[in-house]
Amino acid sequence: MTALQDMAKAQLVLPAPAKLNLMLHILGRRPDGYHELQTLFQFLDYGDELGFTVREDGEIRLQTDVPGVPHDSNLIVKAARALQKQSGCTLGMDIWLEKRLPMGGGIGGGSSDAATTLLALNHLWQLGWDEDRLAQLGLTLGADVPVFVRGHAAFAEGVGEILTPVDPEEPWYLVLVPQVAVSTAEIFSDPLLTRDTPPIKVRPVPKGNSRNDCKAVVERRYPEVRNALNLLGNFTEAKLTGTGSCVFGAFPNKAEADKVSALLTETLTGFVAKGSNISMLHRKLQIL
C-alpha cells in the first residue's frame, strides 16, 4: 500500500499552501550573517497535503511516495519533534505527505509543511498553544515558517519574522517551475547581490515596489530561470519568488492564466492558482 493510500485513513488531512514573495528587498547584512529584508508574502490556493494520525507510543513517523525526501532532517519531522519536546507531550504521530510543491522552488514547500505540522499536532494533541507561541517555535525551524503559522498575507521585515498583516489584490497566477533547485545560501553569499536597498516606510506598500533584489544574481547563475522569466515576460510582468527557482505572473482571471499556461507548459512545468490573503490551511482549521 502506498503512502497516499494510507493517508485516506488519517484522522486529519490538511493543506500546506504555497506562498509567493510579491517583492523582496535586501536592506543590508547583519553582524550575525543574516540579511535584513522587506518582503510581501501572499498565499496560493495550491500546495502539499499532509495526513495525521495520533500514535500512543511517542514515535514520529513520516511516510511519502516522493523519492529523495529525507526523514530525520525533514522539516516536518523536526517540527513534530520540536513541539513534542517543548510541550512535554508523550504522544506520537503518523504523518503522510503528498508532495506537490518543488523543493528549492522559493514557494515555501518545506516551511509550509512544517507550519501545517505544528498546527495539526497542536490540535490533535490538544496542547492549546496560541499562534504566537507556535510562530515563535516555527522561527527556530526557518524564517518563513511563522507566516504560514499565522496564515495571513503579510509585509515581513527583519529576517522575515516581523509580520504586519496586509490585504493586496488576489489575482490568478501562473507559476512556472524551472527544473533546477536554487541554493538560497549561494544567492545570499554572492558578492554581486544588491544589499543596500532603502527601506520602505510607507504603508500600505506602494504598488511600484515589486522588485526582487535576488533576481539579477539568480538569472546570471541559473539560465533555466532566466529562460522562464523571458518566456513569461512576453505575456505579463514576470517575477521571481524568493530566491527561485519558481517564477510567476499575475492575470485578472483564470481563463487568461490558463491560456498562457497552455502555451508555456508545453516546454515548462507550471500550474495556475488563485492568490489568497487567508491561507487555505487556516480556512480549513476554522471549520474543524
UniProtKB/Swiss-Prot annotation:
Residues that hold ATP according to the record: 102-112
Does the entry feature the keyword Ubl conjugation, yes or no? no
Q: Which InterPro entries match?
A: GHMP_kinase_C_dom, GHMP_kinase_C_sf, GHMP_kinase_N_dom, IspE, Ribosomal_Su5_D2-typ_SF, Ribsml_uS5_D2-typ_fold_subgr
* EC category: transferase
Q: Which EC numbers characterise this protein's activity in its record?
A: 2.7.1.148
Q: Which HAMAP family match?
A: IspE (MF_00061)
Which family, according to the similarity comment? Belongs to the GHMP kinase family. IspE subfamily.
What protein does this entry describe? 4-diphosphocytidyl-2-C-methyl-D-erythritol kinase
